[in-house]
């Protein structure tokens, strides 16, 4: 197939210029959230080192929840603040999330929705597949499977990158090196309730994505509603399949992501109620 006949060629050339990373952003953990969480743990009788570790993890949960919320609903920033606040409550009551898992999810979402305004590049791919390998090696084999699935889906949606098919195959190959000997794990009802709440509140976001006005950070172009909806669907698929297969440990790891989904859903609901009341008062 000639280059001019390749349906992927325009996307490949317009989004491949410069750098080896297209999805990452710096995150600052040295803020008030860390200090507050550290103080809370110290008051609970923990030593300084344990308290600081807890504080950093709590701050990470807040920031990753906020960042993931921006990928789920890039039009309504305050939903991320709500999700971040809920993630702190979850960290204090249920324990901290897993930063590696949250980072993996963040990159998967950004690859699918392209809110960065750039496709995934070699550095992003190495990072994603390495995390999938690492988690698979620890017995969580579903992560490389989901990584491969995400790559294949990305190759088929608007502006898809044809090499994603090969990367998907590589991710599936990594599954062969995963530890599949771990037995099935139980899932506590508290996580089932959180998953159900996230699903109910987040579902309207998929419809609202059709009218998104968000623009990519790098190219300044309106992001594809289809890609955003695919990313939202992937979020639900990942958020529910991983805990069902791998149990409480991975449910706790993904709790900040659920809080992000709940946060954007709550803000969308409040926004809709306010608009309905405003329209009613105008009549």
Regions found by a protein language model. Give the residues of each.
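Generic multipass alpha-helical transmembrane bundles of integral membrane proteins
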Residues: 111-112, 117-241
């Amino acid at each position: 197939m000639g280059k001019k006949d390749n349906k992927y060629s325009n996307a490949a050339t317009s989004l491949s210029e410069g750098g080896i990373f297209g999805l990452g952003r710096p995150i600052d953990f040295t803020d008030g959230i860390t200090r507050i969480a550290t103080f809370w743990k110290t008051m609970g009788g923990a030593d300084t080192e344990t308290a600081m570790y807890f504080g950093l993890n709590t701050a990470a949960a807040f920031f990753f929840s906020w960042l993931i919320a921006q990928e789920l609903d890039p039009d309504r920033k305050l939903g991320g603040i709500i999700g971040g606040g809920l993630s702190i409550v979850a960290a204090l009551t249920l324990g901290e999330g897993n930063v590696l898992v949250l980072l993996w999810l963040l990159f998967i979402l950004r690859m699918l929705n392209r809110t960065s305004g750039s496709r995934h590049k070699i550095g992003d791919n190495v990072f994603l597949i390495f995390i999938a390998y690492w988690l698979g090696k620890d017995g969580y084999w579903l992560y490389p499977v989901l990584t491969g699935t995400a790559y294949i889906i990305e190759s088929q949606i608007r502006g898809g990158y044809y090499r994603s098919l090969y990367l998907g195959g590589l991710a599936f190959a990594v599954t062969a090196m995963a530890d599949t000997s771990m037995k099935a794990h139980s899932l506590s009802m508290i996580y089932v309730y959180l998953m159900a709440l996230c699903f109910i509140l987040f579902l309207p976001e998929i419809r609202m994505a059709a009218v998104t006005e968000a623009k990519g950070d790098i190219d300044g172009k309106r992001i594809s509603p289809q890609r955003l909806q695919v990313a939202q669907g992937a979020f639900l698929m990942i958020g529910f399949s991983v805990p069902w297969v791998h149990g409480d440990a991975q449910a706790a790891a993904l709790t900040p992501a659920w809080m992000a989904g709940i946060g954007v859903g709550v803000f969308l609901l409040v926004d809709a109620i306010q608009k309905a009341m405003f329209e009613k008062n105008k009549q």
